[in-house]
């Protein structure tokens, strides 16, 4: 039998901190006591250890377990990851065995793209919300994965707000324009 690298929140508990990390164990415990926690799963600390043992490569066994759990989330939520009409959005949060406040990065709204954001806007009947989610995803991904400074996005957003002094809130057209910073 292959090793289990992912656990649904419903499968874990607070005593599994070494395996699930602090956040994973706490999310599992909150789920177990009935608090309203979005459906999700935790990739184990053993998967991280294996990743480093494999030369910073995610092996096929870990990949298969992750895909299996994404499919499980799709079944539970009725949404589909990467779907343009009813997208499943996930948050990626790192969590160590020991608490390290401010040291770990987060990416929200993974699953959005240029087409899926339109589906989210239609599904929620709220284009501003959908494009704000997408902007946040692109900004976090650019910062965490691509190491693009947050300040580049903030400068562009401030320029848009200045050009449209009617509101300090970004509307959906601003968010469409702010997906990527200009190269200027």
How should these model regions be labeled?
Residues 1-169, 176:
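N-terminal beta-alpha lobe that positions the nucleotide/phosphoryl donor
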Residues 170-184:
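Single conserved hydrophobic/aromatic residue that forms the stacking wall/gate
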């Amino acid at each position: 039998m292959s090793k289990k690298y992912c656990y649904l929140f419903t499968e874990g508990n607070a005593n599994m901190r070494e395996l699930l990390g602090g956040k994973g164990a706490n999310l599992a415990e909150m789920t177990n006591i009935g608090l309203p926690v979005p459906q999700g799963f935790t990739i184990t600390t053993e998967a991280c250890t294996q990743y480093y043992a494999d030369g910073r490569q995610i092996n096929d066994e870990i990949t298969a377990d992750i895909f299996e759990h994404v499919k499980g989330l799709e079944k539970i939520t009725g949404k589909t990851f990467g779907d343009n009409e009813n997208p499943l959005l996930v948050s990626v949060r790192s969590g160590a065995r020991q608490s390290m406040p401010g040291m770990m990065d987060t990416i929200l709204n993974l699953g959005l793209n240029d087409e899926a954001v339109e589906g989210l806007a239609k599904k929620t009947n709220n284009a501003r919300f959908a494009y704000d989610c997408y902007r946040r995803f692109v900004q976090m991904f650019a910062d965490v994965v691509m190491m693009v400074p947050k300040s580049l996005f903030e400068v562009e957003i401030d320029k848009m707000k200045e050009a449209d002094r009617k509101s300090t809130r970004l509307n959906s057209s601003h968010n469409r324009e702010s997906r990527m910073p200009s190269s200027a």
